[in-house]
Amino acid sequence: MNKNFEYPEIASLEQPAKKLVVLLHGVGSDGHDLIGLVPYIKDDLPDCHFISPHGIEPYDMAPYGRQWFSLQDRSPDNISKLLVKNISKLDDIIKQKQEELNLTNKDTIIIGFSQGTMIGLYLTLIQKEPFYCTVGFSGALIPPAEINNKTTPICLIHGELDDVVSVNEMYNASHYLSKYHIPHSGHKLTRLSHSIDGRGIEIAVNFICHTVA
């Protein structure tokens, strides 16, 4: 079996699942990282099946971890090329699980952290069928060459003290999304660096619960 299709997952409390939540980790981590969020949110999202895929490549700046794309060359043009090259592999992972659960994009929620937010936002904007909603923690938006989806609601959450991905990236993303009239909200969290805390989790859960497809 393709290793990309082996990852941590947690079934919905209510069966059958009505929603699929895809958790996308940051660079140098793996799917075991964000699956750790599930115990804090599953009671509020009882009809959601959670998957946390591993990045599709080995992390190329350490002997362990995974990545969605290389960050050795961080120029926007290079990252865009790598996203175009790699995005279909993530799409395939999601489509396989959707088929297994008899769900579609309109039932799918994307939650990303850091590099996971970057690829999650990119994936959201290129979909022909909109996702239910997308949450991005501590990330940045890399614009695709063409936007196919302008209707998926997006929630951006970022620590004001982030010294890995500046909180300015949240404002840049918000400016871009506003330009294309894409529904979104942005939340700057005081006294928070490059991480997810209880405030961010609460914001994300409230956003998901109040999103109307």
Curated annotation (Swiss-Prot):
Catalytic residues identified in the record: S114 (charge relay system), D162 (charge relay system), H194 (charge relay system)
This enzyme's EC code(s): 3.1.-.-
UniProt superkingdom: Bacteria
Gene3D superfamilies: alpha/beta hydrolase
SUPFAM superfamilies (UniProt xref): alpha/beta-Hydrolases
GO molecular function: hydrolase activity
Keywords from the UniProt entry: Hydrolase
Coiled coil: none
Pfam family, one: Abhydrolase_2
UniProt entry tagged with the keyword Hydrolase: yes
InterPro entries membership: AB_hydrolase_fold, LYPA1-2/EST-like, PLipase/COase/thioEstase
Protein family per UniProt: Belongs to the AB hydrolase superfamily. AB hydrolase 2 family.
Protein name in UniProt: Uncharacterized hydrolase RBE_1307
Organism of provenance: Rickettsia bellii (strain RML369-C)
